[in-house]
Curated annotation (Swiss-Prot):
Transmembrane segments: 38-58, 68-88, 102-122, 134-154, 165-185, 209-229
One Gene Ontology term of the molecular function aspect: cobalt ion transmembrane transporter activity
PANTHER family: COBALT TRANSPORT PROTEIN CBIM, PTHR43627
Name of the protein in question: Cobalt transport protein CbiM
GO terms (BP aspect): cobalamin biosynthetic process
InterPro entries per the UniProt record, alphabetical: CbiM, CbiM/NikMN
Phylogenetic classification of the source organism: Bacteria, Bacillati, Bacillota, Clostridia, Lachnospirales
Gene encoding the protein: cbiM
The entry's keywords: Cell membrane, Cobalamin biosynthesis, Cobalt, Cobalt transport, Ion transport, Membrane, Signal, Transmembrane, Transmembrane helix, Transport
Amino acid sequence: MNKKEKRIVAIAAAFALCFGISPAVNAMHIMEGYLPPKYCITWGILSIPFLVAGYFSIKKTVSKQHRSITMLAMAGAFVFVLSSLKIPSVTGSCSHMTGTGLGAILFGPSAVSILGIIVLIFQAILLAHGGLTTLGANTFSMAIAGPFVSFGIYKLCQKLKVNKLSGIFLAAFVGDLFTYCVTSIQLALAYPSSNGGVGASALKFLAVFAPTQVPLAIIEGILTVVIMIGLETYAKAELNDLGLVNGGIN
């Protein structure tokens, strides 16, 4: 590794030490066996096209910019660390940061689908977070829906000439919240309310998630901004390869 790559690895390691050390808890996104089989299969099938697009997106990026491999790994580590810090919220689920906004900004939302599913598989097998039967649902909410919204918000802020740091914050913040909107809908579809159906059930899940998820989304937005500032300082060449330093971060 050259000097800049070592600095990037050092930043990622320091971040993991600061935020990744936490007591082991039996928490997860949507836990193993919680969704009926038909919903597990449906969400898995819906995720497949995005994963295929993500594979080709990463392949194209790496073939054109070999230096991007380190940053791609760092974006994956960011997702792993943040999404492993969980706060129990409702039965069968929990609240946590997602970390996917950073990868969406750097590499686009399709690439993050691959990073996300890798993280979810590791968490399901090694940490007992989430599950293999609910992998499709968790992938769709955290690794697909959230990143696409984050990317859209970031591009919209660019078009509206919003301050770059503010745009990064909003992208991570809104993407995190949207992930939980999708999760609430997934849970509501599987367990509709006896009074009011899916809509009423979704509102109930959202109401329970909100007190913990809104503060976590704010924290994720701030952390994403801090990481981007660090990358602008120590990995400007890599960001330039990805077309992200026009005018600098201001």
